[in-house]
Each structure stands twice: as C-alpha cells, then as structure tokens.
From Swiss-Prot:
Assembly behavior: F-type ATPases have 2 components, CF(1) - the catalytic core - and CF(0) - the membrane proton channel. CF(1) has five subunits: alpha(3), beta(3), gamma(1), delta(1), epsilon(1). CF(0) has three main subunits: a, b and c.
UniProt-recorded name of the protein: ATP synthase gamma chain
Gene Ontology terms, MF aspect: ATP binding; proton-transporting ATP synthase activity, rotational mechanism
Keyword Methyltransferase applies: no
Ranges in coiled-coil conformation: none
Origin organism lineage: Bacteria, Bacillati, Bacillota, Bacilli, Lactobacillales
Lipid bilayer topology: Peripheral membrane protein
Gene3D superfamilies assigned: 3.40.1380.10, ATP synthase, gamma subunit, helix hairpin domain
Pfam families: ATP-synt
Keyword entries, A-Z: ATP synthesis, Cell membrane, CF(1), Hydrogen ion transport, Ion transport, Membrane, Transport
Domain of life of the source: Bacteria
Length: 293
C-alpha cells in the first residue's frame, strides 16, 4: 500500500508541475493576445484610409477606364490559388484543424483533380500538411512572429500578387481564422483578387470633385491597387495571428483547468488510500493484541 501511496503522490507532483507550465503559457498567450488585438485595431485605421482612397479614385465619369483595371476585372478561371494561414506550432486547440479541414472539403468540391488548385502557405503546420498529401505549396513562409510586421510578410505578399498579375492563377483567396473574441473565431475564405468588394458609390463626392492628379488616374491605380491588395492580405494575417494567440490562451487555460481536476481526483484517491492503509494497520494491531490475550 505504501508503494501505491508513493505512486499517487508522484502523479500529483507531476500534474502540479504540468499545471504550472500550462498556466505560465496561458499568461504568455494572454499578453500576446493583448498586443495582437491592439495591432489589429491600429491597422484597421490604415486599411480604411487606403480603401477610401481607392474608392474615391474609382468614382466618377473620369474613372470609367480605370474601373477596367486588370486587378478589378474577373477573367476566365483556369486556376485558383489559396493563401492558407496556420500556426507554426501546436498547442492551439482546433485552430489549425478547422482551416485545413474546410480547405480540403473545398478542394474536393471545386477542384477534385487538383490541377486547377494552388496553395500558398503561411505557417509550418499548413505547409507540412499539404506536403504530406502530395500538394506542393507554390510559396511558403515559416516562423512568423506573433505580431508580424509588414516587412516580415512583404515578400510573400508581393510575390503572390505578382503571380496573379502574371496570370499564373486567375483568382486568389485567403483562408484564415477571423478573431471574434478570446473564446471564438470564425473560419473565413475571402477573395482577394480580383478585387470585387469596392463600390465607387461609397466615394466622397466633394472630395472626388476637388481631386487634382499630377499623374494619370491609371498610373496612380497601377501603384495603389497592389498596395490595397497587400493591405487586405496583411490585414488577414494580423487577424489570423490574433485568433491564434486567443486559441493558444484558451487551450492552455483548458489544460490548466483539466490539470487542477486531475489533482483534485488524485488527492481524493490518495486520501482514501491513506485512510485504507491506516485502517489496515489498526486492524492488524488489534488482531495482534487479541492474539496475545
């Protein structure tokens, strides 16, 4: 019985150590989440201004030709590409599984042969997942920071837009988890290219009428539209990283809570075993005393 008690004590000690680790990881993830939420909030200000500028540039009779820019017009789709944003590590609950499962279902429905399907992977989990299934990413980025700067992702974003402009694929989507709150995220598949969600009717009429352009509208849009596409993709990356940090915090909180429950159950088991051992010893002492009478 003494060995059994020692085993239980060792399990309790081991589980307490695990609980301390997961609790520390939860606190780290919570700090990362706060920074990510602040970064996402600040970026939205920039993204909205870029969007407004593009919308204003596309407003009015003078912008008629500009609205036929190659980044705004759909072309016959021979190949589709998907930017897939996952984490570089585990311990994030179902964060990665949600995205990868949904994308494989989408592939089975719309790209059964796989010949018209390309993936661009941000995150090791996604890249390894597709390689294991014989799908080679056309581009990938691993080891992204928890609060990635634009410089960190500039190359993969610019390369992706360049591939679209060179017609290596005809439409581009981004697949990621949208951060709702610390407990909830939503899997999204959003079209990035061609740009389809701009409404020139949202433009500021007064601003547009007073707009003086030093260069042609077309040449300005040649610079501005890629920047707008970059901002949309970068915004999705920041959003996904925020959701990842939230998922990590929730997963570690769940692990900590589970460890506490295990410790509670083991403590009850230990107390019962100890009580049984004491009862057994008392019984043996009484039996021995009776034998001596």
């Amino acid at each position: 019985m003494a060995v059994s008690l020692n085993d239980i004590k060792n399990k309790i000690a081991s589980t307490k150590n695990t609980s301390q680790i997961t609790n520390a990881m939860q606190m780290v993830s919570a700090a990362k989440l706060g920074k990510s939420e602040e970064a996402a909030k600040n970026f939205q200000v920039y993204a909205q201004k870029v969007r407004k500028l593009v919308t204003d540039m596309l407003h009015g009779h003078e912008a008629e030709n500009a609205r036929h820019h190659s980044m705004l017009i759909s072309r016959p789709v021979k190949k589709s590409a998907y930017i897939v944003i996952t984490s570089d590590r585990g311990l994030v609950g179902g964060y990665n599984a949600t995205i990868l499962k949904a994308l494989m279902e989408l592939k089975a429905e719309y790209h059964p042969t796989g010949e018209d399907f390309e993936v661009i992977c941000i995150g090791s989990v996604g890249a390894d997942f597709f390689r294991a299934r014989g799908i080679q990413p056309v581009y990938e980025l691993r080891g992204l920071a928890d609060q990635p700067s634009f410089d960190e992702v500039r190359k993969i974003i610019s390369k992706t837009i360049e591939m679209y402009q060179n017609e290596l694929f005809d439409e581009l989507y981004v697949c990621y988890n949208h951060h709702v709150n610390s407990l909830t995220s939503q899997m999204r598949v959003e079209q990035m290219l061609p740009i389809i969600d701009l409404d020139p009717n949202e433009a500021d009429e007064d601003y547009t009428l007073n707009l003086e352009l030093e260069s042609s509208r077309d040449s300005i849009l040649d610079q501005l539209l890629p920047q707008f596409a970059e901002s949309m993709i970068y915004g999705a990356i920041i959003d996904a990283k925020t959701a990842e940090n939230a998922a990590g915090m929730t997963a570690m909180q769940t692990a900590t809570d589970n460890a506490k429950k295990v410790i509670s159950d083991l403590t009850i088991q230990y107390n019962r075993a100890r009580q049984a051992a004491i009862t057994q010893e008392i019984t043996e002492i009484v039996a021995g005393a009776s034998a001596l009478e």
